[in-house]
């Protein structure tokens, strides 16, 4: 776990270093001249998220998982998309949800234990996860994610669209054979 955490943090920090470029674009968009203003807001948002997590860990985790699903779906797919519309936003979420769904399907108990390490003590949350696992709702969600991948594969077909399925099946294989933390580290 320590090695995985180190890799995620070190790679994640370099991945997050691109936020500086996004900050410059936002500053230009909103006509903000002082760059320190972006960093101040960035820092305050980070601190606010940590405080919010400490007081409302379950809500924070749910919001994080929803945003992560959208983020991963968009990052893995945007090279195929020419325009941003509501249907693409939904498809990004459905595609990216695979990153959240796969560990729950293949390593349910271990994934729950990771959630508990993140200060999630809400029994209703765990009852809900047990319900969706026992009633095969996770498999249904996996099927929906697969359908979003098929849509992107067939839409404006190019040879590069094959990457969509390589991505989908690599996430499945990683999560089938590896623990959730190692699978996510390799994916990330």
Residue ranges of predicted features:
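Short aromatic-rich membrane-water interface segments that cap or initiate transmembrane helices
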Residues: 123-137
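Alpha-helical transmembrane segments of multi-pass integral membrane proteins
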Residues: 69, 75, 91-111, 134-152, ...
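Multi-pass membrane catalytic core of lipid/isoprenoid biosynthesis enzymes
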Residues: 32-56
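Alpha-helical transmembrane segments and their membrane-interface exit regions
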Residues: 9-18, 65-77, 188
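Short juxtamembrane and helix-loop transition motifs at transmembrane-helix boundaries
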Residues: 17-32, 57-58, 141-154
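Membrane-interface helix-boundary motifs at transmembrane edges
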Residues: 24-34, 78-90, 151-165
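Membrane-interface helix-loop-helix junctions at boundaries between adjacent transmembrane segments
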Residues: 47-105, 116-124
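Transmembrane helix interruption/hinge and helix-loop junction motifs
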Residues: 1-2, 51-61, 175-184
């Amino acid at each position: 776990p320590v090695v995985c955490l180190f890799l995620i943090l070190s790679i994640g920090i370099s991945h997050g270093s691109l936020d500086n470029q996004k900050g410059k674009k936002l500053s230009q968009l909103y006509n903000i001249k002082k760059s320190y203003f972006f960093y101040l807001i960035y820092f305050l948002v980070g601190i606010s998220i940590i405080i919010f997590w400490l007081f409302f860990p379950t809500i924070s985790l749910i919001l994080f998982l929803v945003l992560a699903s959208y983020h991963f779906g968009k990052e893995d797919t945007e090279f195929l998309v020419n325009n941003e519309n509501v249907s693409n936003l939904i498809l990004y979420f459905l595609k990216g949800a695979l990153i959240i769904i796969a560990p729950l399907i293949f390593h349910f108990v271990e994934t729950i234990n990771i959630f508990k390490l993140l200060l999630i003590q809400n029994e209703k949350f765990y009852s809900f996860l047990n319900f969706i696992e026992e009633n095969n709702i996770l498999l249904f969600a996996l099927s929906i994610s697969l359908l979003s991948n098929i849509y992107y594969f067939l839409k404006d077909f190019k040879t590069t669209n094959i990457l969509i399925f390589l991505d989908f099946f690599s996430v499945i294989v990683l999560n089938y054979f590896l623990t959730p933390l190692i699978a996510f580290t390799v994916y990330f």
